[in-house]
Amino acid sequence: MPPKLDPSQIVDVYVRVTGGEVGAASSLAPKIGPLGLAPKKIGEDIAKETAKEWKGLRVTVKLTVQNRQAKVTVVPSAAALVIKALKEPERDRKKVKNIKHNGNISFDDVTEIARIMRPRSIAKELSGTVREILGTCVSVGCTVDGKDPKDLQQEIQEGEIEIPEN
């Protein structure tokens, strides 16, 4: 048997969920069961936390567990932030599969997303993070200020577009 867990110890558990939906408790059980938490209750807490802002989007949720209490924090991916910035109507995940988004977001939105993602980015400078987010825009299928995100990446690379560091 594994050793008993110290109840005052802080443990972080990461789970991918669809916003606003109660995930299967069976998928949560192996991760949080040993920590002395009820998977069904945690599933409901996650659904409640993600229902407002992230409904229908796949996001990562960080569960911080201490003293058999779980604190839910949403850790959105770059793609989730880009799709949220598109402000598209919510779709039924079960009916519509493999969606190509064809909206348009502003370059200011892209830099704002880059600032949010900056701590998790590998890039040395903010301009590199902005280029990462533009790459995500390509994958999502949206345009930025009516232009192809690849063209904007090229302009940043060549120094035609300046991105302030702060």
Curated annotation (Swiss-Prot):
Single GO biological process annotation from the record: translation
GO cellular component: cytosol; cytosolic large ribosomal subunit
UniProt GO molecular function: mRNA binding; rRNA binding; structural constituent of ribosome
SMART domains referenced in this protein's UniProt entry, alphabetically: RL11
Cystine residue pairs: none
Assigned keywords, A-Z: Ribonucleoprotein, Ribosomal protein, RNA-binding, rRNA-binding
Keyword rRNA processing: no
Record has Ribosomal protein as a keyword: yes
Pfam family, one: Ribosomal_L11
Quaternary structure, from the entry: Interacts with ABI1.
Family: Belongs to the universal ribosomal protein uL11 family.
Task performed by this protein: Binds directly to 26S ribosomal RNA.
Database matches in HAMAP family: Ribosomal_uL11 (MF_00736)
Name this polypeptide is given: Large ribosomal subunit protein uL11y
Highest classification ranks of the organism: Eukaryota, Viridiplantae, Streptophyta, Embryophyta, Tracheophyta
